[in-house]
Amino acid sequence: MLSHSHPCCQTASVSRPPRLSFKITAMLSESKQRNPRILCLHGFRTSGLILRSLITSKWPDTVLRNLDLDFLDGPFPATGKSDIERFYDPPYYEWYQASKGFREYRNFEECLDYVEDYMIKHGPFDGLLGFSQGAFLSAALPRMQEQGKALTKVPKVKFLVLISGGKIPGLRFGQPKAAVGAFSSPVRCPSLHFIGERDFLKTEGEVLVESFVEPVVIRHTSGHTIPKLETEAEETVLSFFQRIRKMLSDEASSVRSLM
């Protein structure tokens, strides 16, 4: 199932109005293992609808039919020019803002509250998928949740899909106070990483991989984008999600055995 939800709010505050959703229902496989529910966080000054368009146009049905994807818009309208204006119409959104040198952050805590509120109302979600700014945010959340700094009212984030991401703080970036300690030790959360050979965040992506225990990495020849899945990459993605589906199935069986 694919869905897209957007806010209607001002930069100064985060409001939570009714959402408009677009949904496509996917069938469960014969194994009866349920599809992982994934909250998808788009890149800087883009939108959930744009990320949805990119993924559905570049990833094959063999992958998409086994996933339940929900594409959320960031809480804040874009505060400047978007790099994708030539290709996609507005509106565009941001998850949070930073100073020119990425040394000071604004609205990061408000962003955390906004994401958690959506997860409460529309979850539960099993994992997160993030691209660019959405990947920076997603990568930090499992440890922040573990430390009680974010997502304290929703179930544990069980896995991550990180495309063109990096660490908060990164090699060239400052650090929001709430994210202190997000990578103080290896992150024990199953993770799938996409790193582009021509991506300006390639180095940040490589450093991010080192912060996770047993990460799965797909390297591609493209730049800062959602890559098409060639045969080998498709097999890697399918294998990763089959492992996730089994993990979710085993957890459900364990819960039922205790009832």
Please give the residue ranges for each predicted region.
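Catalytic active-site module of serine/aspartate enzymes centered on a nucleophile-bearing elbow/loop
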Residues: 230-259
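A conserved short beta-strand
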Residues: 150-165
